[in-house]
A protein has these predicted regions:
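N-terminal Sec-pathway targeting helices
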Residues: 1-14
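Catalytic glycan-binding domains that act on GlcNAc-containing polysaccharides
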Residues: 19-161
Length: 161
């Protein structure tokens, strides 16, 4: 092999290592939170809980990457996104940021309800909170006490250190 090809392959390997390592994932998470004007600590906690900063994480249900984005959710948030791009950590985080930002706006800037929707699904949450007047500052996690996974999820993100 020629030196130029080896050098190029080596640089590509370094780039892949930099992009896909957990330290870079943490830094990307902080940057995306700032860019999308999200609560940095809560968005950081969300990604930590979802994937433990593993860029190549995939759930049993098919959620992909750092933000554990379902392909159908990605298409809903960014209609023309090729699903394969969810494997790119930055694209995945941007999609997660846009989705949680959408949910926060939908649920009157209430993080606990937005997090429940991120975890359990919008439709499920909409049915659960039907006719509820949402207060921005109120913690609604107890509404989800009968949904142990979502209740625990909200607690982990809102109270993580």
């Amino acid at each position: 092999m020629k030196k130029g090809v080896i050098k190029t392959l080596f640089l590509l390997l370094i780039l892949v290592i930099l992009i896909y390592n957990p330290l870079s994932a943490r830094l990307f998470t902080l940057a995306i939170a700032i860019i999308y004007d999200l609560d940095v600590q809560l968005f950081y906690n969300l990604v930590k809980v979802e994937s433990s900063f593993r860029s190549l994480a995939i759930s049993k249900k098919g959620a992909i990457g750092l933000g554990q984005i379902m392909p159908s959710t990605a298409k809903y948030i960014i209609p023309k996104i090729p699903v394969i791009l969810l494997w790119c950590p930055i694209v995945n985080l941007i999609t997660a940021a846009k989705y949680i930002k959408y949910l926060i706006a939908k649920y009157n800037h209430n993080w606990s309800i937005a997090l429940a929707a991120y975890n359990w699904g919008e439709t499920n949450v909409d049915k659960k909170i039907k006719n509820l007047q949402i207060n921005t500052d109120k913690k609604y996690k107890n509404i989800f006490k009968d949904i142990p996974e979502s209740y625990s999820y909200i607690n982990k993100i809102m109270h993580a250190e």
